[in-house]
Amino acid sequence: MALTRYQIRNEYGLADKELYQSADKEDPEALLEAASMAGLVGVLRQLGDLSEFAAEVFHCLHEQLMTTAARGHGLAMRLQHLEADFPSVEIPILSQTDHSTFFYEPGLEWHSDLQTKEDLISPRNLPRCIMDSYEECHGPPQLFLLDKFDVAGSGSCLKRYSDPSLLKTHTTSAVVATSKLGKDKRLRQSKKKGSHTTIKETPEDSRTSHAKLHQLFFLEHVENGHRNPEFHVKLKRRQLNGPPINSSSGASYMEKFLKNSSPYCERVHGTMDQSSPAMETEVTVCSEQEDLPIPSLVYSNSGGTRKYNEMEIESIAGHEILEIPFVPHEITVNEKSPVVCLESSSSVNLCCKTNNDADSPASTESEVKEAGSDDKAGCDHGFPGFGQPQICTNAEVNQTEVLTQFSNVLRHSPEEGESSLLCTDIQRASPESKPHKAEEAAVDLDESFSQMTPDIDSAGMGTLEILQTPFSLSCYESPANLPEDSGSHLELQSNKANAEACEVFEVRRDPMLNISPETHLLKVTQVPQDAYEGGTNDVHSQHVFSVETASEISVSALVEDQFSSITNQEIEALESEDISSEAGHFIPDTKKSLNETSVALESDFLLPNHYISTFDNFEDLSLSADAQDYAAPKEDETNSQDGSSMNPAQSKHISTSEISSENGTLMSDTPRDLHTGYGSLSASSCLEDGLANPDLAEISSYSGQEDPQTMSIVSDDSSDPEVPIPDGTCFAGDVDHDNQTGLNNKAIETVPQKELETISDPQESLLGTEECLSSEYCLQIQNQRQESPSETGSANSRTSSDESPPTQNGSVGVQSSPLDVFPSSITEIEALHAPYQEIFTSLNDHISESVLSKGLTDEEDFLNVSPESILPLSTSLHETPQANPEITPPLPPLPPTQWWMGKLVESTEMPSLAGSGNNSFNIQRDENTQNGSVQANEAQYPSEVSVTDGENHNFHIYTEESKATEEQSPSGVNGTSDTYMESKHKCLNRTPEDSFSLAESAQGLEADWRTEAMALEWFSQNLREHNNPHPAKLEEEEPQVDHPLEKPGQTKFRQTLRDNNSYNQNQKAGKLKRDEDTLVIGIDRSMLRKVSEGNRTHVGARVDENDSLLEIIRSKSFNLRPADASGRPNFQVAVPKTNLKVAAILEKANTLRQAMAGSDDEHDSDSWSE
């Protein structure tokens, strides 16, 4: 330690001089003592100075030491915190798979403790020794320390790293040169484009807009933090693949950028060869849109519509010629020409597929998958929706050959897999009819056409499907939805917003194109199967073409005139072989003339072997905005689970489009098989006009056995669940009626009311089997029962099991709602069913074996009946629903109708079920329903039996006046919704002879359901005390069964029992007639509240409870003998009939009532025993 700054004084100088001056100089000892004393004092003073200096030095050292120690402790604490927090940060970072967030997040949010000021690395609290190292490094790296620049010699290889000027000037010069080059190029492009712009678009406007757009790109990239935005702008311009503003199409910069954003466009959209010397097709464009009225559904078209007398190609280009190369090829064809169809393979190509044998499901599935994978490449230069209206065009028929080429408009959306139909997509980029270049794809043909091979049958028995351009053109804004699932589930979606009116599907798993028209035009073409002739089975994979429009241009007048002129035209289908973009060869097809008859044109455009189905008449079309009708497909050979498949040779058919109407006021002029449904599948029947054609062997609306794959109809209506279609189901054609009271009289006059089947449950209105719409049934309905139904399946139907789902055993949902209104009188019933008495008598043997089926599940709320067990509903004679404004519509009923009426009489409602000639239901009752199975399943399905749509239906209950009484179905004791399913198909059309002579068939069931009738009586009586809108009417509807308990306050009910008993004794005379205004009222579950524990009242909790129970047990508790064989029920007024199961039934009923009633204080006093 340096002590140089402190001067150490002499000890003698520090000492006091008097110490040695006062001594005697003569005496040496005295002088020595004085000098030593002075030196000692000086040393002590020197030690004091040293101590002061030491204190000053060590004080500073102590302060620095204490500061360092405190900072070390702080660092140790921070280190402990970091060690604790590190795993929680390390695990998410190391487990993160996507590191893209590292590039976009600034990183400050990860480190919240860091200061966000200027000094992030060196905060002010750093030690000075560390801060000095930062303060010294102020300047840039000292590049002069590098090696000197050497042009040649040993240091020349280090030029780039040793020359400082290269590092300084390279980046700036490159950026300046690039920017100048880009600006010059843009100016040249603007000048070039400005010379070609139209009158309305000046070069100055294009330059300024273009410059502003690039400036916008520049600013955008600067804001995003890109280092060199000029290069990014250049990359965006490189993607435009051409000049930014197209003079021919008039497309703007941004439109072209948006349209070319798909990477598939370059591959799909190739322009047609202009140098080929083959067929020339002039293309012109319509200068303005023309509003054509929607075709009238009832009246004929008014004037003012534009008539197209010739089939001509309307187009797009400024008289540029698009040429299609053709190579002649001769094909010898029969009268039955080969099938010419379009198939979706290799991104929609024109092809002719040879199918000499039936397509196997595996091959067709693979084709569908290949088509779906190739459709992803399908794209178009002009997507509908970008302000480019699409127009429908006509094809010009030349003397020798016709151009029926379709552009690639299979749009495949990656979200939904939407597939649309092959059509000539002629686009108008702007309403000002700017000229188009050929590369703008006036008629875009796919470069990758698949090989087109003529389909020539070995036996020469193919069918020629003429693909006419006016019938195959599409003009729409939104394509249809046909998603294809990996499990081959075809799902038909009905979008309310798009108002898709029709979907055509094919269960043969053929790669089939379908289109759902918008609200303007509809055409359905079904692809049928050839008749089995000569032992060969020709199943041709064909496609369905639709004509539709969503813009203001209507094609009604166009196709109307084509209908009038098509009879003498020569229609040629383009049939070519080995067509590809590389070879560039087309083959003209042979000419075939079609002479259609007027009957075929009027009805369904039916030809003997040319299965072409078009519209019936434009006046007969009823476009639906809310539902679809589906043309029934052909059956698949692989599906024969039920053993009741029909002969395919009898099913040469054309399925006509069944039009559904939202208001229900418009129907076709010719009678069809109409069904009132909401979202059900429909298979329309052929018209009567087509029956007069002898060439149509057997025209049937045959719906066959469908493919085993499950097909589901998905509707946007939330009340319509996804209904699985069973294997053997066929669909009845239906017409949606949202407002049944507004049926037009003119429309009703055209359709006989006896042919209307009311099937109006919106959830499970799947009706019929493969026999339901058979050819015999179609002929019988259209000829108004001039022919009787023939072989329609086995009468001895097998019983459907509870375990097997409907999709496996081919069961059908037979479900209806109380919209079915019974006939008004017994006389009318007898008059309606007089010709069918022999049918009723023949079915009586099957009725006696009828038992109740418990085939309901909670998910699929329809009766589980095998398709074999259902005969065609050919004589269902319901009346049309009549609205009664005086009576309010019934709420969703909890108990069945039989509980309210109380007429649990044994003499069979099941004969009335089969008495209508509809079905022979062999329904089997489950034995488990005896033991108190009074369930509240009705409340789980309130919407199933409710009358919706705001209609006031008067539900009349009628009584027969002659030999028999009207009796409800014994299935009412089950309490589930299958009671409704049976009661809705009971038309009450049996005669007095039938109802009384068949009364013995249900006597065997009396012992089973009589005991359960007691619980139902309690239930109905309790419900009556909650709802008393019509007390007088409900008194007459009290259950006509004996009370198990005698209770006070029931004198009036006893009198009702005596009246009913006297009525049963005089049953043949028919003295008592129920009021026709009886209203069945249901109780909603929301109206009832639960009873609290303390307020529960037990059944029969009265003074005489013990006595009455003892009397019951003493008299009839073990009386299990079968009922007597008399036609009348054996009612005893004084002593009720019961057994030991009554207690369990009553307990269950009481528990059910307490669960449903709720704790209502007003009704606690008057409980069951009132």
Swiss-Prot record:
The ranges of region (Disordered) come to: 180-207, 356-376, 631-674, 701-742, 783-819, 960-980, 1026-1046
**What quaternary structure, including any partners, is listed in this protein's UniProt entry?**
Interacts with SPK1.
Gene it is expressed from: SCAR4
Q: Which organism is it from?
A: Arabidopsis thaliana
Q: Which GO terms describe its molecular function?
A: actin binding
Tell me what this protein is called.
Protein SCAR4
Q: Which family does it belong to?
A: Belongs to the SCAR/WAVE family.
Principal place where this protein is found? Answer: cytoplasm
Please explain the role this protein plays, according to its UniProt record.
Involved in regulation of actin and microtubule organization. Part of a WAVE complex that activates the Arp2/3 complex. Regulates trichome branch positioning and expansion.
Q: In which tissues is it expressed?
A: Expressed in expanding cotyledons, expanding leaves and expanding siliques containing developing embryos. Detected in unopened flower buds and in the expanding tip region of roots. Reduced expression in mature leaves.
Q: Name one GO biological process term.
A: positive regulation of actin nucleation
Subcellular localization(s) per the UniProt record: Cytoplasm, Cytoskeleton
Residues forming the WH2 domain are 1105-1123
